[in-house]
Amino acid sequence: MLSTHLLFLATTLLTSLFHPIAAHVAKRSGSLQQITDFGDNPTGVGMYIYVPNNLASNPGIVVAIHYCTGTGPGYYSNSPYATLSEQYGFIVIYPSSPYSGGCWDVSSQATLTHNGGGNSNSIANMVTWTISEYGADSKKVYVTGSSSGAMMTNVMAATYPELFAAGTVYSGVSAGCFYSDTNQVDGWNSTCAQGDVITTPEHWASIAEAMYPGYSGSRPKMQIYHGSVDTTLYPQNYYETCKQWAGVFGYDYSAPESTEANTPQTNYETTIWGDNLQGIFATGVGHTVPIHGDKDMEWFGFA
């Protein structure tokens, strides 16, 4: 069971909220649609979809997951993905949390299990519906998110690795770090948030791999962003998340291939462990790191 792999994780009710993303977003030519009949939706997650006027044949898909206090329509308005979809022709799915605080369930056994009936299951069903409905390319499906949505991005990559080719994580925590030993849904974990859950790459990898027992196929490449002065999800969570994916991909966490200063911009440092993992640490940046849409397009292979 997943719970046997986890360390000293404490859960409490949500006591603080994440800050929304501020972004300049250009006008889009399409419109956001709500979809209510995408299939099994065990936790009542809302689905919103943006289909660009410039839709490619066999288009790609980007799943863009909002922060706490947010909604799918809010993330549509305050992130660049719909605008970028008009340029590159992909579809954007904006899941919307069913909970009053707008956070995602990244704590219950259900959401941390493949086909377990949690939020992750609902989002996965949105992806498969969109592939079928629009003839999308199942090999060009990507996931990204900010804050609570970044946590869910890691969870989606662990629970449904077969669905995604790549992910970008803006200020999140490792998959399983918010696990609730009381099976609390949408629980807040102060121990994890404060960066006090520290373990080895191998242990983190075992936590992620336990979310889909027996899976041996490909996994999405991951790009991890975090700010050095984040006081909501402390910077140690950056290192633990990079450890997790280094362990999953079999990289030596202690010996990255390269480290590039002032990349992709001044005061950002990019660490590359291999083709499947990059970490980007933003000095002087709090919660959350702003979305780098153009860089996401490069990571996803659109640009």
Curated annotation (Swiss-Prot):
Q: Which GO terms describe its cellular component?
A: extracellular region
* Post-translational modification (record): Glycosylated.
Catalysed reactions, semicolon-separated: Deacetylation of xylans and xylo-oligosaccharides
What family does the Swiss-Prot or TrEMBL record give for this protein? Belongs to the carbohydrate esterase 1 (CE1) family. AxeA subfamily.
Task: Extract the PANTHER family matched here.
Answer: FERULOYL ESTERASE B (PTHR43037:SF3), UNNAMED PRODUCT-RELATED (PTHR43037)
Task performed by this protein: Acetylxylan esterase involved in the hydrolysis of xylan, a major structural heterogeneous polysaccharide found in plant biomass representing the second most abundant polysaccharide in the biosphere, after cellulose. Degrades acetylated xylans by cleaving acetyl side groups from the hetero-xylan backbone.
Q: What is the designated name of this protein?
A: Acetylxylan esterase A
